[in-house]
Amino acid sequence: MNDCGSLFNKKLFKMNLLFKHLKLQQHLKLQQKPLLNNSSINNNINNNNNNNNNNNSNNDSNNTNTNIFNNSFLNSDLIERLIIKFTIGYLKNNITEDYIEQILLENQNNFIKSTTTSNYILEENNNNNNNNNNNNNNNNNNNNNNNNNNNNNNNNNSSSSSSSILSKFNKLEEDNELELQKKQKQQLEQQEEELFNQFNFLEGIEDQNDFLSEQETIQKIKFLIKMTAKSMSNYSSPNTLIPSVSKTYISPFGLSSNGSTNNHNNNNNNNHHHHSNNGNLIESSNNVNNQLNVSNYNNNNSNHYDENNQFDIFLIPTEMLVHLLSFLSANDLWRISLTCKRIWYIVDVFKFWELLFEQTCPRIYYAMQFNSRWSNPTSFQSKMILCYIDRLPTDNYKNFDKSDESGQIKKIIGVMNENLHNPMILRETCYILKRLSYRQRKEDEHESLIARYGGISLILQAMKNHPYDAGVQEDACGALGNLTCDSPNNMGLYSNDNYLSVVEQGGIQLILQAMKNHMMNPGVQYNTSFVLRNLARNDVSESRVAIEGGIQSIATAMKNHPNHIGIQTQGCGALRNLGCNDSNKVLSAKEGGIGLILRAMRSFSSHPDLQLNGCGALRNLARNEDNKNMISRQNGIQLVLGAMSNHPDDPDVQDEGCAALINLAYQDEANEETIAREGGINLILKAMRNHPFHSGVQMQGRGALKNLSCNPKNKLTIARSGGIELMNIAMQNHPNFANRFLELSRILQVALEDGNI
């Protein structure tokens, strides 16, 4: 039995000493961020040199609201008793899920959720297991009597579950003080020295100065936890909190994991004897409890260490575990969080994933804070991506751009490159690229970095590899839409050439194929319409989209999803850009595009973006004479005027509305009269008054008034309604176009003079 428990004792005392040496209980506070970096370790060590080991329990009780782990509760004597309690389960060698819950919830380490702090705190129940006491042998009657006396003394503490957190800690302090009073003063004074001696013996080193190297000690504990995490279950079942809890062991030279099924069967035996890994018979838990004490640990000559004996991760005290978890990488943190609910709650409460995400990928963390699908930065998707980044070979992110902080964007590209046949990974990486390319800050230029890293090619490859995966197609097209999104400058030129890369690499065919494969999927239809809208920027790309059947696909999407405002908006925008080509004007009308645009404008009259794109589409399509007549017959003029009336403060809607009226009124006397009769002149003048410094509104308003002034009655109405004054103001605010405003001003002045005569 001593051989079986020797390595176990050795490891526990090493961690116990480190925990006591750092005095983490003085620094962990829920109201502040946990000290999880290396600098906090050094601060803790420095503080330890200035603080005495005996702390005043009254000071701790006064600070209960700010420090949930007070010194009176976490004294070395209590930790020793916790270790002994958990050692019983280790030596019984029958740990199952139920037994772990029993140890964690019924004995010493009980996680409860505080109603005042909404966090989990550690509570000591001081209740022994009644089932184990009933199964004791007759030779242990004295031990049973002592345990029963302890239970009677602590009944008041265990029965106050509904009391406040402060009262619970006060009772715990009283129990701890009673326990400490029972010990001899000499044992309390020599405790630290004895533990130091035990550590030096158990470590097998002669020079005591080695223990004073805090960094080396921390590295050993860090390695211990990391190796333990490697032996745990992988993350193949992401949505399962705790798939199966089994006892996990670690040794310096080998790893093994004993299942809980056989151990559970052994627990049902009536002989209450258990066998260790090397075949030696182990006594029952109560007999072992009498032998596991400090005096046995000092028996140096009788211990022969078996390096193949293993260590149980579940025995680490919670406060120590909180500190040790901060050293783990993403992969190890995920594996260890699946071992039991206790560790899962610790990782969740202290926000280890969020801190790790923010430290390793700050740009991605910022981009993913504002999204619709990832409810918070520590969702399962973020955990999965962090784990894949952690295991990514360094060759995938070498030589990253200087503007790419820590190469985090290139790492995402590397994860895509390594998992081109994994649709789940591809969808999440495409979604990250979509969020990164959506420029939230002017200084961000992520779309150019993604293009230089070959992100566009990988996105298209993902679409090609998984044509029937709606999630991949949706997020891939969404990423392409943001990567190709750009606005023209004052000269009408675009600075983003990513759309050319998509067209040259066959992106149009893949996008249209996605629309055909997922016709009834609104997410796919929205993002494909969005990217087609951005691709139709010049004559070459417009023709390519039309030849491949893009206009038909867009019209079909608008027909199948009439109540989806996003699809209607992007569809109108795509038809708007495609309508710049003369042949596309005819094809759009043939496919029913005009009717679809007018229906969308009626259905979503209060949505400015849709009205903007609807007016823009009608503007381009109305340059065809047949289309202009079709728009007029279907009350398109009234819808354009309604958009201007409903959104007077939106300069873009006013701009496109005036532009649409220019083409609808061009050399068409009937439309000129209709526009004037429906109040179009007043709406144009109002737009120019409300937006005097918007060049688009001023120029398009001036053009609409000029076409309407071809009608003598309209000309006089414009002059008398303040049109001349507005032209003079526009000349001052926009001197580059002063000649055009002056021309219309003279025409109106002549009409006003003739009208007065």
From Swiss-Prot:
Phenotype seen when the gene is deleted: Complete loss of cell junctions. Lacks actin-containing adherens junctions at the top of the stalk tube. Has weak stalks causing the fruiting body to frequently collapse. Displays multiple stalks appearance during late development. Shows no defects in growth or division.
Pfam families per UniProt: ARM_LRRK2, F-box-like
Subcellular localization: Cytoplasm; Cell junction
GO molecular function: alpha-catenin binding
Its biological purpose: Required to regulate pattern formation during multi-cellular stages of development and for the formation of adherens junctions. Plays a structural role during the regulation of stalk formation. Involved in cell signaling. Required for spore-cell differentiation. Overexpression increases number and size of cell junctions and reduces spore-cell formation.
Domain F-box: 310-356
Family: Belongs to the beta-catenin family.
Cross-referenced InterPro entries: ARM-like, ARM-type_fold, ARM_LRRK2, Armadillo, F-box-like_dom_sf, F-box_dom
Coiled-coil portions: 121-205
Gene3D superfamilies hit by this protein: 1.20.1280.50, Leucine-rich Repeat Variant
Organism per entry: Dictyostelium discoideum (Social amoeba)
Source organism superkingdom: Eukaryota
Membrane-crossing segments per the record: none
Biased composition, class Low complexity, residue ranges: 125-164, 256-270
ARM repeats: 454-498, 506-548, 549-591, 592-634, 635-678, 679-723
Example GO BP: culmination involved in sorocarp development
GO cellular component: adherens junction; basal cortex; cell-cell junction; centrosome; cytoplasm
Protein name: Protein aardvark
Keywords for the protein's UniProt record, in alphabetical order: Cell adhesion, Cell junction, Coiled coil, Cytoplasm, Developmental protein, Repeat
Gene: aarA
Positions of region (Disordered): 39-63, 122-166, 256-285
